[in-house]
A protein has these predicted regions:
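Hydrophobic N-terminal alpha-helices or hydrophobic patches in metabolic proteins across all domains
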Residues: 1-160
Length: 160
């Protein structure tokens, strides 16, 4: 994954592919912070037209632009302003702290609720609604990543 927003940030950064830089999209309207490093899987295209989103559990934040090799545990399915959206939940492959966590079901229940809560309310003050649909496991996450990779390759082939 490529980190756009480090853990504990209250700013939403996005990668601008046309300019090749990370830019500030907006500060969060709510007094919240991202519960993990947040970014995207390069070379993917999700249903929302952007690369597939990833939230990586971290003890300490990394930095914007950091490449982290991750292991997907599953994903959170949600509806964001009437659009389907998925957030892969992952852990760094190199971290011994998460070596025994293989699926989203093994993530501490309170941490899962914190993540759900964040994605439920982080856009409320912007007047946007987000609804949680549930968690899916690592097999579904790998399939989602492969499907989004294929969508990216198909879109790229159409423009060449």
């Amino acid at each position: 994954m490529i980190v756009e927003i480090p853990k504990n940030s209250a700013n939403k950064y996005e990668y601008d592919g046309k300019l090749g830089v990370f830019r500030l999209d907006r500060p969060l309207y709510s007094p919240l912070h991202y519960p993990g490093d947040y970014g995207f899987v390069p070379g993917t295209l999700a249903d929302d037209g952007d690369p597939l989103d990833v939230l990586t559990l971290m003890s300490e934040p990394s930095f914007t632009g950091c490449l982290i090799e991750v292991r997907p545990l599953g994903f959170l399915e949600l509806v964001d302003s009437s659009e389907r959206d998925q957030k892969i939940l992952a852990v760094p492959k190199s971290s011994p702290r998460y070596s025994e966590i293989a699926t989203v079901d093994q993530v501490w229940p309170h941490m899962r609720r914190e993540i759900e809560h964040f994605f439920t309310i982080y856009k409320e003050l912007e007047g946007k609604e987000t609804r949680i649909e549930g968690w899916r496991g690592p097999i579904d996450a790998r399939k989602l990543i492969l499907d989004c990779r294929q969508a990216y390759l198909d879109a790229k082939a159409e423009t060449e």
